[in-house]
């Protein structure tokens, strides 16, 4: 299944706010109207919608998400929390959380077009897994800095998660540590996602 490129508002109307996908928010009450039209949700549908939320927020294909679930299962600790850590430490998501890109698709474009350096080297893989002490900067070109400045200017200036530090005038972000689960940028029940895949495989 390919990455979603359709109307974004349609997705947030059904699944709720997905800040990684779009800055738009569903109108108040639209979720309640959808629920009343569709009646009581089955357990399968509840798990499916949580999985879809995760997939669309982080901009993943079905195959990519399944791969992350399998990696998380093999790691020590809670599978759900490890899964969220893996997704949050992706380079495209780190750029989004720093405010250097307005959405995760915008961050992916910055990376694909080689505007971003990690530890002084160009990285053009959006799924690159950032590590503590990584230094993320804009390429030293006017176009790269201008693109990031637009995002920084329009950023809502929310409190940065404690695993990141931003130096906006230097177009630089630092990864201080692996993200703590309480700073994850999406309201989600990750256990339902794990359950969804455990029943599929």
UniProtKB/Swiss-Prot annotation:
Keywords of this entry: Chloroplast, Plastid, Ribonucleoprotein, Ribosomal protein, RNA-binding, rRNA-binding
Annotated GO CC locations: chloroplast; small ribosomal subunit
Principal localisation: plastid
Cross-referenced InterPro entries: Ribosomal_uS4, Ribosomal_uS4_bac-type, Ribosomal_uS4_CS, Ribosomal_uS4_N, S4_RNA-bd, S4_RNA-bd_sf
Molecular function as annotated in GO: rRNA binding; structural constituent of ribosome
Subcellular location: Plastid, Chloroplast
Superkingdom, natural source: Eukaryota
One GO biological process term: ribosomal small subunit biogenesis
Domain S4 RNA-binding: 89-150
Region (Disordered), start-end ranges: 20-44
Its job: One of the primary rRNA binding proteins, it binds directly to 16S rRNA where it nucleates assembly of the body of the 30S subunit. With S5 and S12 plays an important role in translational accuracy.
Subunit field text: Part of the 30S ribosomal subunit. Contacts protein S5. The interaction surface between S4 and S5 is involved in control of translational fidelity.
Family per similarity comment: Belongs to the universal ribosomal protein uS4 family.
Protein name: Small ribosomal subunit protein uS4c
Record organism: Nicotiana tomentosiformis
Gene assigned in the entry: rps4
């Amino acid at each position: 299944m390919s990455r979603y490129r359709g109307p974004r508002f349609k997705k947030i109307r059904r699944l709720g706010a997905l800040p990684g996908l779009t800055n738009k928010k569903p109108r108040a009450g639209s979720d309640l109207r959808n629920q009343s039209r569709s009646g009581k949700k089955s357990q399968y549908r509840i798990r499916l919608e949580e999985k879809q939320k995760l997939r669309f927020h982080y901009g993943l294909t079905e195959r990519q998400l399944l791969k992350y679930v399998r990696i998380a299962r093999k790691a020590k600790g809670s599978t759900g929390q490890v899964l969220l850590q893996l997704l949050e430490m992706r380079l495209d998501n780190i750029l989004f959380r720093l405010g250097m890109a307005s959405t995760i698709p915008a961050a992916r474009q910055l990376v694909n077009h080689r505007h971003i350096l990690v530890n002084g080297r160009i990285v053009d893989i959006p799924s690159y897994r950032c590590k503590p002490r990584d230094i993320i900067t804009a390429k030293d070109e006017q176009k790269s800095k201008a693109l990031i400045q637009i995002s920084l200017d329009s950023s809502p200036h929310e409190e940065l998660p404690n695993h990141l530090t931003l130096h906006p005038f230097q177009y630089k972000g630092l990864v201080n540590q692996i993200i703590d689960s309480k700073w994850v940028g999406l309201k989600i029940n990750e256990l339902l996602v794990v359950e969804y895949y455990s029943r599929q495989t």
